Design a protein with these regions (language model features):
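Serine/threonine-rich, repeat-prone extracellular segments and beta-strand-based repeat modules
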Residues: 2-32
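Secondary-structure transition/turn motif
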Residues: 25-29, 68-79
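Edge beta-strands of extracellular beta-sandwich domains
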Residues: 33-40
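Structural signature of tandem-repeat unit edges
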Residues: 39, 62, 78-100, 109-123, ...
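Extracellular interdomain linker/stem segments of modular secreted and single-pass surface proteins
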Residues: 41-47
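GGW-centered surface loops in extracellular recognition modules
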Residues: 50-75, 178
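Consensus positions within tandem repeat domains that build extended binding/scaffold surfaces
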Residues: 103-105, 125-128, 151-154
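Short, aromatic/basic amphipathic alpha-helical patches
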Residues: 151-155, 172-183
């Protein structure tokens, strides 16, 4: 069999994350024979991807709405003053849940004044906000944080007068938790 003589090959959606299709169509004496197949294009786990100056690390490469990422850091650490870590991020047209903040992700981001943490975050690494001396306001929208999944010194070195806005049901637990983690 010779390509373009006996058959043609067409691809659809084969460059971006998601489901791609390949179609092989017979020509000449093979006319009328068609074969179709689909395959998934995913990001490899641990792959780093930057979207809007926030670098993410893929923790689950699923493309069916169950993919997850962790925030690795920011590309403008020396100048950024505010940061919103949402519930999800779109990478290549696919939504990934943001479920973590890596260790030292924002360490020494000295101009960072306010941070919002999305409701899907269930892990904050050690020293994640270490030495963010200007950090004065942290809004926490998740109820999934515990002593086991917030790393040591996650908030050490932030502004002493920093205020935390947290879910009502977590006020007492989070006050104790964040204090234990350096706030």
């Amino acid at each position: 069999l010779k390509k373009n003589t006996d058959y043609t090959v067409k691809y659809k959606n084969n460059k971006n994350i998601g489901t791609a299709t390949i179609t092989v169509t017979g020509k000449g004496k093979y006319k009328g024979i068609t074969a179709k197949a689909t395959f998934k294009i995913t990001l490899p786990e641990k792959q780093k991807v930057t979207v809007s100056k926030i670098t993410y690390r893929v923790t689950n490469a699923a493309v069916n709405g169950k993919g997850t990422v962790s925030v690795k850091g920011i590309t403008d650490k020396k100048t950024r003053t505010s940061l919103t870590i949402g519930k999800t991020v779109k990478i290549g047209g696919v939504s990934y849940k943001i479920t973590g903040i890596d260790s030292s992700a924002f360490a020494n981001a000295s101009k960072l004044k306010s941070v919002t943490i999305g409701s899907n975050v269930r892990q904050i690494g050690a020293k994640a906000f270490y030495n963010c001396k200007s950090l004065a306001k942290v809004t926490v929208n998740t109820s999934k944080l515990t002593d086991k999944n917030v790393g040591a010194n996650a908030f050490k070195g932030i502004k002493p007068t920093c205020t935390f806005k947290v879910p009502k049901a977590k006020i007492s637990a989070y006050k104790k938790l964040f204090k234990a983690k350096g706030a």
